[in-house]
Amino acid sequence: MSKLTDLTMAEARDGLAKGAFTAVELTDAHIKATEAQRHLNAFIVETPDLALEAAKASDARRQAGTAGSMDGLPIGIKDLFCTEGVQTTAASHILEGFKPPYESTVSGKLKAAGAISLGKLNLDEFAMGSSNQTSYFGAVENPWKKTSDPKAKLVPGGSSGGSAAAVAARMVLGATGTDTGGSIRQPAAFCGITGIKPTYGRCSRFGIVAFASSLDQAGPMARTVRDCAIMLGAMAGHDPKDSTSVNMAVPDFERALTGDIRGLKVGIPKEYRPDGLSDEVAKVWDRGIEWLKAAGATPVEISLPHTKYALATYYIIAPAECSSNLARYDGLRYGLRVPGKTLDDMYKKSRAAGFGAEVRRRILIGTYVLSAGYYDAYYAKAQKVRRLIAEDFRKAFETVDVILTPTAPSAAFGMGEGTDDPVTMWLNDVFTIPTSMAGLPGLSLPAGLSADGLPLGLQLIGRPFDEETVFRVAGVMETAANFTAKPEGV
């Protein structure tokens, strides 16, 4: 039998149902894998004792015939989701030691389905970053290595870098992520796993530490398309505590994996071949198009003309919302407090000490674009361009069923690269941001390896609330890609 940590979530679920092993055995195997790979720094908080208690309760439910849809499956929770009684930091000094008195809706739904949390996963501070190097608790290391330089440490992508690294390194069967401009899809591509940002409003944002409220969306990260479908089924659903949560039935995403995509039209946007796109990524994209043709789908060239404005638009809207959301961290009620001579002095000192450089940068940008003299020139104009970007997608989906693009312009890069050049770092999300601006579902799956042995991902974009078609096409591509590689030593 395979090592328990090599099982996919679906395989582990079936094994538990057949009695091949217990939830305690499965959980213990993943706890040991987590302990053996602490050098990756994927977790901020590990909760092995709580996990084993939950596993015992899971085995009891199974014995009683009341097991949930994810009962006994070990997962990790990105440390942006509030977890009752367990430290939640958003990877920031300003929230160090904060233990929420309530549970986020998404983590609560997973717990109700029987999933077992092994702890809180590392991320870029307040989810602001594309490389997981901005965390107050240290950078996360990608478990993959370059064949040409095995000693070089690589980034896992961000902001959900801890989630991606933990899944790729077989510490957990799946993990929650959040995606504001690519924070599920880009790290999934860098770490050779699958991740989906659902349609905005599919999953509740209640209890998720806010970055940009009109963009943030929770989603699953796992090793296969089926595993993501299983997780999203448990995570999604209407929540009256979140006014942006959409009141519609949650489909059986797993049933969408029919393997039949004959007759579907797949959009190939011509604007997604910019200067600087690596030849390897372009070749993987072309290969993906051929896989879909072979399965009976028809590729159709489409135009998304406002794509070129998406990055600039995002870096006006997201910082504007971030500057507003992060105004609540004042050192008064919870988190870090640095004493000052006056109340204003205490605010300034607490925020200066509590926020990292990237977070301060985005707060400053946001405050600037919202200021009286610049609001119309920047923020109001950006919102108009955002509408045009969404309209491009709406028109495209009149003629195609899904859109296929690369996920990231390159494979994972080395730690320390680009940290002194924020614009270069922001360009990592050039293919994922337009989808976020339009609120559409986007899934990344591993499609091949670079010449240096690093994973390369492809992105599928769907119509609003049509994650089922995205999953259906992704399942076919996953079979064609037959991506079985894993990090060495895992």
From Swiss-Prot:
As its record notes, the protein acts as a catalyst of: L-glutamyl-tRNA(Gln) + L-glutamine + ATP + H2O = L-glutaminyl-tRNA(Gln) + L-glutamate + ADP + phosphate + H(+)
GO CC terms on record? glutamyl-tRNA(Gln) amidotransferase complex
User: What superkingdom heads the lineage?
Assistant: Bacteria
**Which Pfam families did the record assign?**
Amidase (PF01425)
Q: Which PROSITE patterns match?
A: AMIDASES (PS00571)
A Gene Ontology molecular function term for this protein is: glutaminyl-tRNA synthase (glutamine-hydrolyzing) activity
Task: List, in alphabetical order, the GO biological process terms annotated in this UniProt record.
Answer: translation
NCBIfam families named among the record's database cross-references: gatA
Q: Which family is it part of?
A: Belongs to the amidase family. GatA subfamily.
Q: Subunit arrangement?
A: Heterotrimer of A, B and C subunits.
- Role summary: Allows the formation of correctly charged Gln-tRNA(Gln) through the transamidation of misacylated Glu-tRNA(Gln) in organisms which lack glutaminyl-tRNA synthetase. The reaction takes place in the presence of glutamine and ATP through an activated gamma-phospho-Glu-tRNA(Gln).
Q: What is this protein called?
A: Glutamyl-tRNA(Gln) amidotransferase subunit A
Q: Which organism is it from?
A: Paramagnetospirillum magneticum (strain ATCC 700264 / AMB-1)
Q: Which gene encodes it?
A: gatA
